[in-house]
């Protein structure tokens, strides 16, 4: 019959093996949930059910510094952490809340990029190319050419800017934003179909003239220039030239504005023959446009009847 000491030793061995068998092993890259169990000068210890408490260095407690660790992470408070190391000989792993937050921020940005929704960036500084700032704890950049207000970038420091994502690359830690879509949306709200506006010629193509109105660009198609044939648009229009146009249609979904000067003519070819005179009187011709449209509606009704 075995002695009691051997029996006790056997039981202790079996107990140790059972502990090893059922020990919780946290893998690197895994997310764990645990409670703060100890504070230290260099960080905090977290009980997440492992063989030993995990350690979180003070710089890994969050995306932004914490003045008083004890206040921000009181004992027994529960948090999620990312395992950033393999277990050492004592079974301890290193944890990070900061890197978990970074992962979550990139995931949020991917959703915002896909949905096309706006986000906010707190401007923290400027450089020759534009402004930099904080976006969910990540470093964002808006090129100067994509800013709504670019004349005094230093005045933007400390401000919260709304923007859309131009490029989000987690592998390269690159986040580039733009305010152009917001600017376009605001500008689109300043104009309405059925009105006459003054704009400037922004570009001339064989198929039409691009005209900038209130910060957005519309197309004056060659077929809508005049009631008579126009062989060369360059004979009538020049870059930067101020002209009056009628807004026929605004397609916000396609971000497209259709313009016309043809509808402003009192007779076909007036724009070609008397360009300056017609442009000078164009702002007064909305009643003419409306009468033409009413006549067109009546003709359409007669054709259908």
Curated annotation (Swiss-Prot):
Similarity remark: Belongs to the bacterial ribosomal protein bS1 family.
PROSITE patterns (UniProt xref): S1
InterPro entries on file: NA-bd_OB-fold, Ribos_protein_bS1-like, Ribosomal_protein_S1-like, S1_domain
Pfam families, A to Z: S1
Any one cellular-component term (Gene Ontology): ribosome
SUPFAM superfamilies xrefs: Nucleic acid-binding proteins
Keyword match Transit peptide: no
Residue ranges of the TM segments: none
GO molecular-function terms, A-Z: mRNA binding; structural constituent of ribosome
Domain S1 motif: 29-98, 116-180, 194-262
Organism superkingdom: Bacteria
Keyword RNA-binding: yes
Protein name in the entry: Small ribosomal subunit protein bS1B
GO biological process: translation
Function: Binds mRNA.
Keyword terms: Repeat, Ribonucleoprotein, Ribosomal protein, RNA-binding
